[in-house]
A protein has these predicted regions:
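Conserved beta-strand/loop subsegment of P-loop NTPase cores
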Residues: 21-23, 93-100, 116-159
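Switch II (G3) loop of P-loop NTPases
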Residues: 22-33, 40-86, 90
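Conserved glycine(s) of the Walker
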Residues: 1-2
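Hydrophobic positions on the alpha1 helix immediately C-terminal to the Walker A/P-loop
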Residues: 5, 9, 37
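Conserved Switch II/interswitch segment of TRAFAC-class P-loop GTPases
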Residues: 76-80, 92-110, 130-131
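Amphipathic alpha-helical transducer elements in NTP-driven molecular machines
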Residues: 32-35, 52-59, 81-84, 106-110, ...
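NTP-binding/hydrolysis catalytic cores, primarily Walker-type P-loop NTPases
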Residues: 141-203
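Walker A/P-loop NTP-binding motif
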Residues: 10-15
Length: 203
């Protein structure tokens, strides 16, 4: 899920910035088990993690960590407007990234895209193998200038071929769920759609 994506992003950047150059902050997250999981993953990567519950504490912690090259702030999916506001107060130039399961609903996507202060920089997808309905996220990638940056436990997606492969897999899965189409036709249709908007999904 999202906490695992945070770990993979931090781990992917540790070679560039070093473990001591990265910090992870869990902000205003009361999900059961989320903090212990983040602590465990951070410890396995040798990266410091912190837990903060309010805007004042977040601002103070970000200021204290100003020497770090990368600070990752993990927030829950509820109270998104308030959380983004707190992040903008603590770190006005922070880049905000979406993390969705591959079968996220259109309603959830709409709710997050409506948060104008976020200025979403990219999308990371989770639960690719368990996806039952990828069409909402496919439509989102086609209609919005938000690049796909991470997919599951993969390293960062850095070129169009990698993005197209992920989109092709999602489209193929969606087509198979809609109708019992022959495999060759499914693969062809998915590849065609992937080529159509893979360029819009990566910068």
């Amino acid at each position: 899920g999202k906490t695992s994506i945070v770990y993979h992003i931090a781990n992917a950047h540790s070679q560039l910035h070093g473990q001591d150059g990265i910090a992870i902050i869990s902000f205003n997250d009361n999900r059961l088990g989320a903090w212990p999981q983040l602590q465990l993953l951070s410890a396995s990567a040798g990266i410091d993690c912190f837990k903060i519950k309010n805007t004042t504490g977040l601002s103070e912690l970000v200021a204290n960590l100003s020497n770090r090259k990368l600070i990752i702030i993990d927030t829950p999916s509820n109270q998104i407007e308030e959380n983004i506001g707190a992040i903008r107060t603590a770190a006005s130039h922070a880049a905000c990234h979406l993390v969705f399961p591959a079968d996220v609903s259109a309603g959830t996507i709409k709710r997050f895209l409506a948060v104008e202060r976020a200025h979403w920089q990219s999308l990371a997808l989770t639960k690719l193998d368990d996806c039952l309905n990828p069409w909402a996220v496919i439509q989102m990638l086609a209609e919005n200038d938000i690049p796909l940056s991470f997919a599951g436990a993969r390293s960062a997606l850095e070129n169009k071929a990698e993005v197209a492969a992920i989109i092709n897999a999602l489209v193929g899965r969606g087509i198979r769920l809609l109708a019992p189409t022959p495999l060759t036709q499914t693969a062809w249709a998915g590849a065609t759609l992937a080529r159509t908007f893979a360029g819009a999904a990566v910068r």
